[in-house]
């Protein structure tokens, strides 16, 4: 029958994906690091899916969107099935703040407006909505429109240490190197 995880994955693929027009996966960084809020969008699932996902990422008040070639996660497998998808990252260290939850709520409303599910006027009525305060990244630049200037990373590089041990970052998330 497979592991519990395999059963969950099969249920998602069988019951969720066939009816999905768009998928968004919310994450909270990794247990070992803090991250600047960003969105992964799939680039390994064809031009149509990539364009729809990238346009959706651009509609969100996040500083970064990152092209992803992943093929085996919830959002990336949805993309392989022809469903535009995003993975949003915010926070880290296995915890979250109310501000991060509020920022995710705003991002979800922004996505629903982008997908023409809700009218743009709904954004103003979201309780406590303030785009200038929704982004926790120290290097964010809020444009006169209230939107956050967003940049794109086309090639993601992961650094790996040559040996085992503990990682103690010497810089904070969002620092310019």
Q: Where are each of the predicted segments found?
A:
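Structured catalytic-domain cores with a bias toward divalent-metal coordination
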Residues: 1-177
């Amino acid at each position: 029958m497979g592991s519990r995880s395999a059963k969950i994955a099969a249920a998602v693929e069988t019951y969720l994906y066939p009816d999905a027009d768009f998928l968004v996966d919310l994450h909270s960084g990794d247990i070992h690091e803090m991250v600047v809020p960003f969105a992964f969008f799939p680039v390994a699932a064809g031009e149509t899916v990539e364009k729809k996902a990238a346009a959706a990422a651009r509609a969100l008040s996040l500083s970064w969107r990152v092209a992803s070639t992943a093929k085996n996660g919830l959002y990336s497998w949805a993309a392989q099935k022809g469903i535009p998808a995003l993975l949003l990252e915010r926070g880290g260290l296995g915890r979250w703040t109310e501000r991060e939850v509020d920022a995710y709520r705003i991002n979800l409303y922004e996505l629903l407006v982008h997908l023409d599910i809700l009218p743009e006027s709904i954004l103003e009525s979201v309780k406590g909505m303030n785009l200038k305060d929704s982004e926790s990244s120290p290097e964010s630049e809020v444009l006169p429109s209230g939107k956050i200037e967003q940049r794109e990373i086309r090639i993601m590089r992961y650094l790996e240490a040559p040996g085992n041990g503990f990682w103690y970052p010497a810089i904070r998330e969002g620092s310019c190197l």
